[in-house]
Amino acid sequence: MRKIFLLSAYLLCSVFVRAVEIPFQKSEVKSIMRKVADWQIANPHPAPEHDDLNWPQGALYVGMVDWAELAEKEDGDDTYYKWLTRIGRRNCWQPDKRFYHADDIAVSQSFLDLYRKYKDEEMIVPTLARTEWIINHPSKGSFKLVEGDLKTLERWTWCDALFMAPPVYAKLYMLTGDKKYKIARATCR
């Protein structure tokens, strides 16, 4: 009896869930994506510690590059590529200040994507210089992450660091074919 009740409850719930599912149309999803992108552009983070080159912006730019590609491909709208390019130009395509810190090179992911699209050497030179320097001067910092000890942030010892820095090295490898970027990515500089 109990099995029949549980089976009946499961079937009723699954029918009810299916009945309330509302599939989104592609145009609706794109409209929401556009609204979110436009809101992000119109409402930059006001805190000075989250300037153009800081990691939250780097994460935003990664998503914005994907949106820019879609908006241009499907709607002929290059607004978002132009916005990303303005950010790169006003910062001279530089990563953020701390050389070894994974967060501070995250913005380079979008700069490299823009380089891939436009083939403008200016977009890639600062990232190449930074990664070359890091490869030639590997951190001697500990792999043990110590709360409050900034020296331990020289190594990619926290989980989101794997989103921040290794993709830059992977993209450089894809762009140049130079295996040193593949090796550097694998060694957690």
What positions do the PLM features span?
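Structural signature of alpha-solenoid helical repeat scaffolds
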Residues: 52, 99-102, 119, 157
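Bacterial Sec-dependent N-terminal signal peptides
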Residues: 1-21
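Well-ordered alpha-helical scaffold segments within catalytic/enzyme domains
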Residues: 20-22, 58-75, 106-120, 164-178
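Aromatic- and glycine-enriched pocket-lining scaffold segments that form the walls
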Residues: 143-189
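Blade-loop segments of beta-propeller domains
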Residues: 83-116
